[in-house]
Design a protein with these regions (language model features):
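Generic structural signal for well-ordered, non-membrane alpha-helical segments
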Residues: 50-58, 121, 125, 205, ...
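Extended, positively charged loop/linker patches that create polyanion-binding surfaces
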Residues: 118-181
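Small beta-barrel nucleic-acid-binding modules, primarily SNase/OB-fold domains
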Residues: 19-25, 29, 113, 124, ...
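A glycine-rich, hydrophobic loop/mini-helix early in the fold
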Residues: 74-129
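Acidic, glycine-rich flexible loop/linker segments
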Residues: 162-239
Length: 244
């Protein structure tokens, strides 16, 4: 693994787009703009999200709602980033067939969000990931366990999970799809927005998508200005006005 230094962090953080000339007030973002290339919002929305991190999206959502949007415990199973509209599923860990039902019913570009309960067992792995990727599913977020890590780490298909283990149940198909999910104090609905990367997973309610995207834009503009000042040698505490 490459050594991370302050210089490389700055270089990594500088993966920002020049948004200074964009009048964000002219845009009315909808989650449907993500897959609608004819929408006037599509290009800018993709630019913002492609260059954003879960940290920035969470900060933005916090400024809008007072909540982080983070689903605790979820972590990436590979280096792939994902964002998109959620298609939900709920199943006992004895049944990985429900994951296939969700995959079969989800639309291209959607992200599967699968909630599992029961004893530790996997409901997602290499075969499901390969099939989902071929169908055009954007990725899988699994509130449960994945498996086949030797394959998942090399697949160009995003998978997020609580952890991984080798055992699995059976293809029963007895769970539910396209239903509301409750995780701790969070209600995740079909059609909500999810964003996941190496930092974790953030869920944004559909009704707050526009406000959160505008706030994400503003976070990115602010951070790009801060990075420019840091490269001039200024202290971060000075830039943000921290009392000393």
């Amino acid at each position: 693994m490459a050594k991370i230094t302050p210089k490389t962090l700055l270089k990594k953080s500088s993966k920002v787009i020049d948004l200074d000339d964009v009048d964000i007030s002219k845009y009315d973002f909808s989650i449907d703009d993500l897959d609608n290339e004819k929408s006037k919002n599509h290009a800018l929305l993709k630019k913002i999200l492609d260059s954003s991190s879960a940290c920035q999206v969470s900060d933005a959502f916090s400024s809008v709602s007072g909540r982080s949007g983070v689903i605790d415990g979820l972590k990436p199973m590979n280096d792939n980033k994902v964002y998109g509209k959620i298609f939900t599923a709920k199943t006992n860990t004895d049944d990985w067939g429900t994951s296939l039902m969700a995959m079969d019913n989800a639309e291209k570009g959607e992200v599967l969000f699968i909630y599992t309960y029961g004893k530790p067992a996997s409901v997602w792995g290499e075969l499901a990931s390969t099939c989902a990727g071929e169908k055009g599913i954007a990725g899988t977020v699994l509130y449960g366990w994945a498996r086949d890590m030797d394959a998942l780490v090399d697949l160009d298909y995003p998978v997020f999970a609580l952890d991984y283990l080798p055992n699995a149940g059976k293809a029963l198909g007895l769970g539910e799809i396209n239903v509301d999910l409750e995780i701790d104090d969070d209600i995740i609905k079909p059609g909500d927005f999810v964003f996941g990367d190496q930092n974790g997973v953030v869920v944004i309610p559909n009704e707050l998508f526009h406000e959160t995207m505008v706030a994400t834009f503003n976070v990115k503009v602010k951070e790009s200005h801060i990075i420019k000042e840091l490269k001039k040698g200024r202290l971060l505490s000075e830039i943000i006005g921290l009392n000393r």
